């Protein structure tokens, strides 16, 4: 199994619109993130938008997506801070339906949207950013995120990754969703297996046992390209549910992070995390009680993350 340096990572300002990365507050937020977490790695996630899960065209040139120049500037700035960078161009749906539900008929039907047309647009989207990854010296290119209903289209995914490799010579990964690691049958064509680690606080050992079988089968490095828990009461039991509403539970979020780190430390094959997520518009630390989301800034979970990442940096 090829090894990779341990990833003490954070997903920074995913899906921000044009203009966001040109603001000084975004750079200040990135500096604060590095100082407060001891992170050595970030994922940047440009936003590609299609109208619905059954739309064939992905747009990444509108005002809803950071410009190429902004993205390059943020990559360069992050690297100047000593951060390793990965790009994860991500397809989303304008109507708010989660990208995992992007799906088409398996057999082409006249007058109906088709996988072939969608993958052609998706490949163009990914290749555009793969060229930026190569130009800017990014360490990794992550070819997609939580595209659950598409993952059985093995031929198209292999073709997409082969095309990306023509433009990008670094590490290539794909970020599958929680509970799906064993359902991807084409891990052999990526360099690094990654997934979204939103597992209940009391289920980490069970899920890691399952994932370990996949890692052993394919003999690839593994990390969690996303992982996080909201500081909302109940989130630690179902951390993937961003619709949970309730009172603030700062300690519950911190406990979830500590449980994840403790469980994964027993597994040498877990090579890190890119935690979800850190905003480009930080709230005032005094207002933390008003923020029950995945953010960890000025919350007890931030201390848990900093301690773990500091320990890994010294190892």
Stretches found by the model and what they are:
Residues 2-4, 21, 263, 267-315:
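Aromatic-rich peripheral "rim/lid" segments of glycoside hydrolase catalytic domains that contact
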Residues 6, 39-56, 70-150, 279-281:
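Substrate-binding cleft and catalytic face of glycoside hydrolase catalytic domains
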Residues 19-34, 59-80, 124:
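Aromatic- and glycine-enriched glycan-recognition loops and surfaces
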Residues 33, 42, 141, 193, ...:
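Conserved, mostly hydrophobic/aromatic
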Residues 66-68, 73, 80-84, 88, ...:
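Glycoside hydrolase catalytic-domain groove-lining segments
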